[in-house]
A protein has these predicted regions:
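Intrinsically disordered, low-complexity N-terminal regions enriched in serine/proline/glycine
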Residues: 3-5, 31, 78, 126
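Intrinsic, low-complexity N-terminal interaction/targeting segments
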Residues: 28-51
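Short sequence/structural elements of tandem HEAT/ARM alpha-solenoid repeats
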Residues: 11-14, 30-36, 81
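Short, small-residue-biased leader/transition segments that mark boundaries at the very start
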Residues: 1-13
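Terminal, non-catalytic domain-edge segments
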Residues: 15, 43-51, 58-190
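Short, recurring structural edge motifs at helix starts
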Residues: 3, 50-53
Length: 190
């Protein structure tokens, strides 16, 4: 039936949006991993050899952006509901000024510096190492692999600003923005 073919992308999008909601960790680790297991809790799993089973700062920031897109497309507030939990999680894993100095890192205004991965259950930073034979993960920030950063700058302020903007929209403004978002998505797909 041709109607099924036309509804397939919509069903697939709906499945993806539901999956993003389901994969978010519970408080206080309300983030996302690079990969999740298919266990009862969709817990973080190992991805590539050097990507440990842990919550990931960049995946968390990107999923927040996706949830805000889903809200723009659907108008369903369930996509905004747990974003503040993710913001709290990112704040909880951020490096303070002394830690950034120790790591020799700095960030731009509005950004925070976070470990790329944190341990499930503890939020301890996980650092990536290798020798010619294998990769390993531990808590020591010395002697890190050079082809994959163990820290990430997250523009948390811009995420918070976008979130507040979406909350502040009137129904009329929201309708106009939703139509614009759909038109932009359609034109970029061409």
């Amino acid at each position: 039936d041709h109607r099924d073919l036309h509804s397939f992308p919509t069903r697939r999008s709906s499945d993806l949006m539901t999956c993003v909601l389901a994969l978010q960790g519970g408080k206080p680790q309300a983030g996302w991993a690079m990969q999740h297991k298919l266990d009862l809790n969709y817990s973080p799993g190992h991805a590539r050899d050097f990507e440990p089973a842990g919550y990931a700062a960049t995946a968390t920031a990107e999923m927040c952006r996706n949830l805000m897109r889903f809200y723009r497309w659907t108008g369903d507030t369930k996509y905004l509901a747990r974003i503040p939990d993710a913001f709290e999680f990112l704040e909880s894993i951020r490096y303070n000024d002394a830690q950034m100095k120790q790591l020799g890192k700095s960030v731009k205004p509005g950004q925070i510096l976070c470990p790329t991965f944190v341990e499930v259950g503890t939020n301890r930073p996980l650092y990536l190492h290798n020798d010619p034979d294998h990769y390993w993960v531990d808590y020591d920030y010395h002697g890190l692999i050079t082809h994959y950063s163990s820290t990430r700058a997250i523009d948390l302020q811009s995420l918070k600003d976008e979130y507040q903007h979406l909350l502040s929209l009137s129904k009329e403004d929201f309708s106009a923005e939703t139509a614009l978002a759909i038109a932009q998505a359609a034109s970029s797909a061409l």
